[in-house]
């Protein structure tokens, strides 16, 4: 009887000893593998110059901080450049290989093939509805047209500045603008905007709040409208909501990774809404050439000087980024 109990205890102790030995052996093997792997990673990290691809990933929204690539010092190898041009440019050039030619010319200025993107838009009005500025640096070419001067000015004001915007429910609420930086921005296929200022008794000043036909018309069938009214006064609004969206926006400051190059015209457009301030012409430039090849040649020649006036931002800028700040 005692012999059986002693044998059982001895087997139990032997099993524990063997299990402990096996666990220690496995631990030593795993430590050896992990340490060797880490050693190889450390050695390779000192040899290979890794690029942080996350720097150029598109991000929906808007961030103020400028991000620098910590693993590469070459300014253009980790940057992207978008050049936006009207469709009339490609129609005039009429060459299926012209983009490849332009890409090779940018290469002579230090911009590798694949880092420059040429993006076409139909016209100023169409570009205003859905501006998409995804690159680290964005250059927008605008052909001057005296009949579209105000449209060009509004578009430049939109893309050259950072806006914090919120949706507006104009069927339920009255709205007022608090200061000069506060604007109402409408975009869509057809925007007609009417306003009715209200007194302290919420009665219309020169209009009837129940009759939109008596409202003051500030825009008619436009694709982009930046509305500025008297600050501190409530307004009842009427907008063609079926084809247009209006938002209450606050201008936060310049969007420094965007520049506008005006093609033609006697003077650079002034996009400043406040008549008492100095004209805003930062990151607005002018090129006077009749032919589009001449325009593109000049852009290539001065591209590196132009981006010195800009700041690289690692973010994607589409229409939602203009309107919703993250």
Curated annotation (Swiss-Prot):
Residues 253-255 are annotated as: GPR motif. Ca(2+) 2 binds at residues 177, 228-229, 231, 301. The lineage of its organism: Viruses, Riboviria, Orthornavirae, Duplornaviricota, Resentoviricetes. The keyword Glycoprotein applies. Ca(2+) 1 binds at residues 95, 206, 214, 216. Homotrimer; disulfide-linked. 2 Ca(2+) ions bound at each subunit interface in the trimer hold the trimer together. Interacts with the intermediate capsid protein VP6. Interacts with the outer capsid protein VP5*. Residues 165-167 are annotated as: CNP motif. GO terms for cellular component: host cell endoplasmic reticulum lumen; T=13 icosahedral viral capsid; viral outer capsid. The keyword Signal applies. One of its GO terms (molecular function) is metal ion binding. Some rotavirus strains are neuraminidase-sensitive and require sialic acid to attach to the cell surface. Some rotavirus strains are integrin-dependent. Some rotavirus strains depend on ganglioside for their entry into the host cell. Hsp70 also seems to be involved in the entry of some strains. Keywords: Calcium, Capsid protein, Disulfide bond, Glycoprotein, Host endoplasmic reticulum, Host-virus interaction, Metal-binding, Outer capsid protein, Signal, T=13 icosahedral capsid protein, Virion. It comes from Rotavirus A (strain RVA/Cow/France/RF/1975/G6P6[1]) (RV-A). It is found in: Virion; Host endoplasmic reticulum lumen. This is Outer capsid glycoprotein VP7. Its main location: virion. Disulfide bonds join 82-135, 165-249, 191-244, 196-207. Calcium-binding protein that interacts with rotavirus cell receptors once the initial attachment by VP4 has been achieved. Rotavirus attachment and entry into the host cell probably involves multiple sequential contacts between the outer capsid proteins VP4 and VP7, and the cell receptors. Following entry into the host cell, low intracellular or intravesicular Ca(2+) concentration probably causes the calcium-stabilized VP7 trimers to dissociate from the virion. This step is probably necessary for the membrane-disrupting entry step and the release of VP4, which is locked onto the virion by VP7. Glycans are attached at residues 238, 318.
């Amino acid at each position: 009887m005692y012999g059986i109990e002693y044998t059982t205890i001895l087997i139990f102790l032997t099993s524990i000893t063997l299990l402990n030995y096996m666990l220690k052996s496995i631990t030593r093997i795993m430590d050896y593998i992990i340490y060797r792997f880490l050693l190889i990673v450390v050695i390779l990290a000192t040899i290979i110059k890794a690029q942080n691809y996350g720097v150029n990933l598109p991000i929906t929204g808007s961030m103020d901080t400028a991000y620098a690539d910590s693993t590469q010092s070459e300014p253009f190898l980790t940057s992207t450049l978008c050049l936006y041009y009207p469709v009339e440019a490609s129609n005039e050039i009429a060459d299926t290989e012209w983009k490849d030619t332009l890409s090779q010319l940018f290469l002579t200025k230090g911009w590798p093939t694949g880092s420059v993107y040429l993006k076409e838009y139909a016209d100023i009005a169409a570009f205003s509805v859905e501006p998409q500025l995804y690159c680290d640096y964005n250059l927008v070419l605008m052909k001057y047209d005296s009949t579209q001067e105000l449209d060009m000015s509004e578009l430049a004001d939109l893309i050259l500045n950072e806006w914090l915007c919120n949706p507006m429910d104009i069927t339920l609420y009255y709205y007022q603008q608090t200061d000069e930086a506060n604007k109402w921005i409408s975009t869509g296929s057809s925007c007609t905007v009417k306003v009715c200022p209200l007194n302290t008794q919420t009665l219309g000043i020169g209009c009837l709040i129940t009759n939109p036909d008596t409202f003051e018309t500030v825009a008619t069938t436009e694709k982009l409208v930046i509305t500025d009214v008297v600050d501190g006064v409530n307004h009842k609004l009427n907008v063609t909501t079926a084809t247009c969206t209006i938002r209450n926006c606050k201008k936060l400051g310049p969007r420094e990774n965007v520049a506008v190059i005006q093609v033609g015209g006697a003077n650079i457009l002034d996009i400043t809404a406040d008549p008492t301030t100095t004209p805003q012409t930062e990151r607005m430039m002018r090129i006077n050439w009749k032919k589009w090849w001449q325009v593109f040649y000049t852009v290539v020649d001065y591209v590196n000087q132009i981006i010195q006036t800009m700041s690289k931002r690692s973010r994607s800028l589409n229409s939602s980024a203009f309107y919703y700040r993250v």
